[in-house]
Structure formats: structure tokens, C-alpha cells
UniProtKB/Swiss-Prot annotation:
Belongs to the peptidase S33 family. ABHD4/ABHD5 subfamily. One of its GO terms (cellular component) is lipid droplet. InterPro entries: AB_hydrolase_1, AB_hydrolase_fold. This is 1-acylglycerol-3-phosphate O-acyltransferase ABHD5. It comes from Sus scrofa. GO terms for biological process: cell differentiation; fatty acid metabolic process; lipid homeostasis; negative regulation of triglyceride storage; phosphatidic acid biosynthetic process; positive regulation of triglyceride catabolic process. The gene is ABHD5. The modification N-acetylalanine is found at A2. SUPFAM superfamilies: alpha/beta-Hydrolases (SSF53474). It is found in: Cytoplasm; Lipid droplet. Coenzyme A-dependent lysophosphatidic acid acyltransferase that catalyzes the transfer of an acyl group on a lysophosphatidic acid. Functions preferentially with 1-oleoyl-lysophosphatidic acid followed by 1-palmitoyl-lysophosphatidic acid, 1-stearoyl-lysophosphatidic acid and 1-arachidonoyl-lysophosphatidic acid as lipid acceptor. Functions preferentially with arachidonoyl-CoA followed by oleoyl-CoA as acyl group donors. Functions in phosphatidic acid biosynthesis. May regulate the cellular storage of triacylglycerol through activation of the phospholipase PNPLA2. The HXXXXD motif is essential for acyltransferase activity and may constitute the binding site for the phosphate moiety of the glycerol-3-phosphate. A motif (HXXXXD motif) lies at residues 327-332. It catalyses: a 1-acyl-sn-glycero-3-phosphate + an acyl-CoA = a 1,2-diacyl-sn-glycero-3-phosphate + CoA; 1-(9Z-octadecenoyl)-sn-glycero-3-phosphate + (9Z)-octadecenoyl-CoA = 1,2-di-(9Z-octadecenoyl)-sn-glycero-3-phosphate + CoA; 1-(9Z-octadecenoyl)-sn-glycero-3-phosphate + hexadecanoyl-CoA = 1-(9Z)-octadecenoyl-2-hexadecanoyl-sn-glycero-3-phosphate + CoA; 1-(9Z-octadecenoyl)-sn-glycero-3-phosphate + octadecanoyl-CoA = 1-(9Z-octadecenoyl)-2-octadecanoyl-sn-glycero-3-phosphate + CoA.
Length: 349
């Protein structure tokens, strides 16, 4: 990966065809250049030296990658996988601390951010495999032997899936508020049944991608993000006083919905995974230590850590709660989060 930034092609397979992609630029005030500028505004505030550029994988695809290092080569690198709808820029509050004593890599998942946005399969298992293989090809391209793999949300699910398939490459698996672990509860067993109107709305929205509303909103999409998620501006207020982060999130999610469509094909109504990870994680190599980090104030079910422990009774599994943090643990309480992650990484070396 070159030290200087290299421009990525903006003509991936799914961008060359289809009425939607031809219509989007005229309706949504976005482009790959807008996304690049939004990312650059974020990275300018990162307090450490980094290299960025595309890593080429198969089928002409590229994985947009950031490497941070203080010329430390004898430590196992930490690799960060962002969640659904995110990008590598959202780790801005963490880069400075995490790279002090080991190399840190962050990249935009295939189909997200500034990485290529190809057409994914429609089968959930094959989609998962496409993501996993893109991570493995990325690792091979960079010549990394073993890594500490950390994933948030969707990134946590994919980190676990990768660890299942390529256990010899993972020194420690860190799951941060992971998506897709429990199976959907039986509606009849829920203490608070889902109201009929919500079920009807869910059925009506099933044909659409999760973030289609942003693209439909067109020129009003950015203000929609700012109104619906003002918390992101607060989370990053120590680094940015303006709408830098919400602009970045907007431009990440109004491009061609490649990864978004892939995610939709991995889900069943109300956002549950078609292939829950708890059904498989017991088969993971018992030598891989697993740490599960949750926000104590998160609305996401935090019982997956306990479930993983019961499914891997003879393996290292530790659950860590970050006080005062919600689902976006790394942004809600970055200092505590960074400290816990560094402590985990130190046990590996």
C-alpha cells in the first residue's frame, strides 16, 4: 500500500449499470469526491502518522485501507472492522491511542465507504462468504501473518465468521456490540409483542434497503441525518465542532447501496440474522480467545457474551461492559474503550 493516497476508480460493476445509479447523482448531492473530502476532513484530525490507499483483491475490487504505525513491526497488528453504515473514519477517536505500541489497520468493508461496491449474491451464506473472502484476500495482499481482529456491529459478525473459516490467522477476536449473534425470538414468546402497525410497516418496507430513505430524501438527506442522529455530532465534539461526522456518514450511505443490499440479504424482518452466529460459534477453534465488549447503556441485547461463554466452556471468553456507553462504545467512551482494547492486545504479545 502506497504512502501517498491513490485515487480509486468510481466505476465498479454496480456503478456502471442500473437506472438507480444514473439517477442518484442528480437527486442526491453526493459523489465519490464528496465522500473523499468528507473522509479527509476527519483524518486531518487524527493525531498520528498514517498511510492510506486501496488494496487490490480479486475481480478488480479494491479495499480502501488506512494503516497507522509508529514504526513498530514486532507486534501483532490490530485490525478494525466497522459496523453497518459506517466507514474507517468513525474510528477517529481511537486511532491515536490504539497505535501507540502496535500497527493498526482499518478498512472500509467491501461494499461500504470508499471500497469497491460490487454486486453481491442474494443468498445469505454466499454473501457472508464473499465478505469473509474479501477480508482474507486483503490480509494476503498486505502479507499479514496473524492479526488481532476487532469488529463492531456487522463488523463483529464478519470478524467471527472470518475466525471460523481462518482460525490460524486470528490471535484474538474482539467483538464490540456484535450484530447477528442471537436468533430472532418467537413472537409468541416475547414479553412485549410487536404492535400490529409495526409489523405492517415492516412488511411494507421489506422490499427496500435499510437506508433507502436517505437516497429518496435526495437533497434533504443530509439534514435528515443531522436531525435523526444529532448524537453523532455530540459523540465527536471533542474532535469536531461542526457537522463533519454526520456529513461523512451521509456520503458513506447515499452512494451505490452495495454493502447495504448485501446486509439486507443476510437479514430477516426486524434486522435479525438469517444465519445467527450463536448457532456456529461453538465450532470455532477453541484456542482463539474471545473478548466481548458492550456498552452498559446499550439498547442491544448484551447476553451474547454469556451465551458465547456457555458454548465455549473450555476456551477463553471474557465479557467487558463499558460504563456510560451505548451501542457506539468506541465513540461514547473512547478513553475507556481504548484502554480496554489495549489491555486485551497486550495479553496477545
Amino acid at each position: 500500500m502506497a504512502a501517498e493516497e491513490e485515487e480509486m476508480d468510481s466505476t465498479d460493476a454496480c456503478e456502471r449499470s442500473g437506472w438507480l445509479t444514473g439517477w442518484l447523482p442528480t437527486w442526491c448531492p453526493t459523489s465519490t469526491s464528496h465522500l473523499k473530502e468528507a473522509e479527509e476532513k476527519i483524518l486531518k484530525c487524527v493525531p498520528c502518522i498514517y498511510k492510506k490507499g486501496p488494496v487490490r483483491i480479486s475481480n478488480g475490487n479494491k479495499i480502501w485501507t488506512l494503516k497507522l504505525s509508529h514504526n513498530i513491526s514486532n507486534k501483532i497488528p490490530l485490525v478494525l472492522l466497522h459496523g453497518f453504515g459506517g466507514g474507517l473514519g468513525l474510528w477517529a477517536l481511537n486511532f491515536g491511542d490504539l497505535c501507540t505500541n502496535r500497527p493498526v489497520y482499518a478498512f472500509d468493508l467491501l461494499g461500504f465507504g470508499r471500497s469497491s461496491r460490487p454486486r453481491f449474491d442474494t443468498d445469505a451464506e454466499e454473501v457472508e462468504n464473499q465478505f469473509v473472502e474479501s477480508i482474507e484476500e486483503w490480509r494476503c495482499a498486505l502479507g499479514l501473518d496473524k492479526v488481532i481482529l476487532l469488529g463492531h456491529n456487522l463488523g463483529g459478525f464478519l470478524a467471527a465468521a472470518y475466525s471460523l473459516k481462518y482460525p490460524s490467522r486470528v490471535s484474538h477476536l474482539i467483538l464490540v456490540e456484535p450484530w447477528g449473534f442471537p436468533e430472532r425470538p418467537d413472537l409468541a414468546d416475547q414479553e412485549r409483542p410487536i404492535p400490529v402497525w409495526i409489523r405492517a410497516l415492516g412488511a411494507a418496507l421489506t422490499p427496500f434497503n435499510p437506508l433507502a430513505g436517505l437516497r429518496i430524501a435526495g437533497p434533504f438527506g443530509l439534514s435528515l441525518v443531522q436531525r435523526l442522529r444529532p448524537d453523532f455530532k455530540r459523540k465527536y465534539s471533542s474532535m469536531f465542532e461542526d457537522d463533519t461526522v454526520t456529513e461523512y456518514i451521509y456520503h458513506c450511505n447515499v452512494q451505490t447501496p452495495s454493502g447495504e443490499t448485501a446486509f439486507k440479504n443476510m437479514t430477516i424482518p426486524y434486522g435479525w440474522a438469517k444465519r445467527p452466529m450463536l448457532h456456529r460459534i461453538g465450532k470455532m477453534n477453541p484456542d482463539i480467545p474471545v473478548s466481548v465488549i458492550y456498552g452498559a447503556r446499550s439498547c442491544i441485547d448484551g447476553n451474547s457474551g454469556t451465551s458465547i461463554q456457555s458454548l465455549r466452556p473450555h476456551s477463553y471468553v471474557k465479557t467487558i461492559a463499558i460504563l456510560g456507553a451505548g451501542h457506539y462504545v468506541y465513540a461514547d467512551q473512547p478513553e475507556d474503550f481504548n484502554l480496554k482494547v489495549k489491555e486485551i492486545c497486550d495479553t496477545v504479545d
